[in-house]
Amino acid sequence: MKSYRWLTLSAALGITVLEAWLFTAASASASQIDSHSTDNAADSGQALYSTYCGACHQANGEGMAGAFPPLKGSGVVNRADATKHIDIVLGGLQGVRASGVTYSNAMPAFAATLSDAEIAAIIDYERAAWGNHGSLIGPAQVASERARLN
């Protein structure tokens, strides 16, 4: 009887160790996937920013004096509610005044050029880069705002 008891306890211990190992392996894989997805989204946002925004707002987000406003430290970019930020990217903007400076050059509208996912990636990049701390968004939020504006 004692040998069956030890056998049962050994089997239970073995199963517990196996479950713990499988759980740890699955958690590590999920973590790697999440990290990889986040890295890809950030890379995508940075690449899209470089293509569509960087010439005017510059790679460092500081803009061009008197021509294009900075995104680094921008009130619109750092606002908790991203609606205005989305509206500007979708609809463009001209004659903006920021920090006491008027920027006369026009920003084109990207509603017809970029998808909701691309706009979200750019905005998320801008809201996280250069020390900015705006809340991040997703394609669904861009789609909702696009529908509201149409």
Task: Give the ranges of each region predicted by the language model.
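Electrostatic cytochrome c docking/interface patches
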Residues: 23-48, 63, 138
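Sequence/structural segment immediately N-terminal to covalent heme-attachment motifs in c-type
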Residues: 39-64, 77-91
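Flexible coil segments in periplasmic/lumen-exposed cytochrome c-class electron-transfer proteins
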Residues: 30-36, 97, 101-150
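Short cysteine/histidine-rich zinc-coordinating motifs and their immediately flanking basic loops
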Residues: 65-70
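Bacterial N-terminal signal peptides that target proteins for export
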Residues: 2-14
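N-terminal targeting and processing segments of secreted/endomembrane and organelle-targeted proteins
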Residues: 3-6, 22-26
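A short beta-alpha structural unit
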Residues: 72-74
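Hydrophobic alpha-helical membrane-insertion segments, chiefly the h-region
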Residues: 15-23
